[in-house]
């Protein structure tokens, strides 16, 4: 059988399975939905469902199902489906998600700005009607030691506490990733172009950071972060 025919069968069965499961009730794992003072909104989905259960929760166009089915990793497919489950939860109307050439997500049928992040266990989105956004989430079970050399400035390295280093590195990394997503630029040097001010590690807190453009123009940002269930999440609006 040719590869094209095989792929068509996989896509067909994927969509068919979604239709079969639609008659069953599945418990939704919306972990957090939070409206911020700046009128942005954050929603977090805990991925506890199977792939089949996630399919039952959502209504996805055939072309999007085809795109999701191309991912070989079940974890990646579940993350994509969980994003769509969040969109269904947050928006009253059906949203169509797409991506720019640089990978930045956008909603085809809505002017609302969106940023997306995910781990194996959690998927999160942040939305705002006008302002640019950035969000990133990471598991604290990951070893962030490599971040120190590749993404931190000398001043940031000096501010590290040996007893809390991995947590601090995770926050630094998430903050810089969130800013990177917000700026939507290619080839950003995290160590040289994004400077995060020293902070006191807490379960929830605020961060100050500076993005240095290649023409040396500086842009300042205020970020927020929270730690939950061995995960760190950092976001910014504006």
Give residue ranges: language-model regions.
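Cysteine-centered motifs
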Residues: 2-5
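Core catalytic alpha/beta fold that binds nucleotide/phospho-ligands
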Residues: 16, 20-238
